[in-house]
């Protein structure tokens, strides 16, 4: 709870909580390493685990922050992933996936708009292809295999929306987040298929108009210098704008930073570039109306138990990238219509608001509440 408070006081107003569910779904673990195909999990989430999730969500929301919860390490490349961007996998697992989300949604059906659901994290095809579907296909790229993977992603996204909406309550209009294939962002020009995950992603059908969000992840490299990283950011964000945001839903970068192999030394050897990089990323995202969630490293490992920021320079750069050179100066109450009418208000994605409802907004570089 102190960790959440630290982030709130620094100027962050939303936290994405990655959650692993499979060990808490009637898992027997009779094989080592565990293989979900031969030792399947059940569908019922353990009450104790759901209570722990509930506890962490309440930590975030009690601070007036927004909270995203998801199905996280049940996807990816490890042997524990039971959700795969594959049509056969979808046929076998979609009912379990829907049951998981029905339980989560029912648990939190009375929570207000401060809680958002993200359907799945980085779902890959059967060959664990990153960057775009079928990139790791044996022999060569297969358009048929890629198409099947994109179809599966869109099917899982639709199942997620359907399962949550069916639970009613505040879930009928809860903001729901769907990720592209592998949460790919279309960054790079080294292959003609890099933007396919953006182009092939569909906006799910939803009875609640305006309550869906797309998510991508981005880890530009600093190995070729700051200017190269900035060019990659510009190219990538233009692609996201053209091929994803244009489909009628806002976009968030649910994870971003630099690749893992650079993290150890970058903050020491490339400190100035790192600060400029993170500030530029946030500034460009805000200009386009994209939300940003930096992945992990600002307070990691043992630093979380203190708690303290192990990369305070990056925290300052990120906050200034959003709020301006004065940084975060706290929340200023806004209580009357004339006050709001005298200054422009923007939501937390940087979009102009002319008829604000109760919530948090940005005015003249300051966070304000109504």
Regions found by a protein language model. Give the residues of each.
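Short, exposed beta-strand-loop hairpins at the edges of beta-sheets
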Residues: 301, 307-309, 362-363
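Residue-level detector of functionally pivotal "anchor" positions at catalytic/ligand-binding pockets or at interdomain
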Residues: 327-349
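Hydrophobic, well-ordered secondary-structure elements that form the walls
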Residues: 292, 350
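Active-site mouth of glycoside hydrolases
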Residues: 1-191
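Acidic carboxylate-rich catalytic motifs and surrounding loops in phosphoryl-/glycosyl-chemistry enzymes
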Residues: 294-300
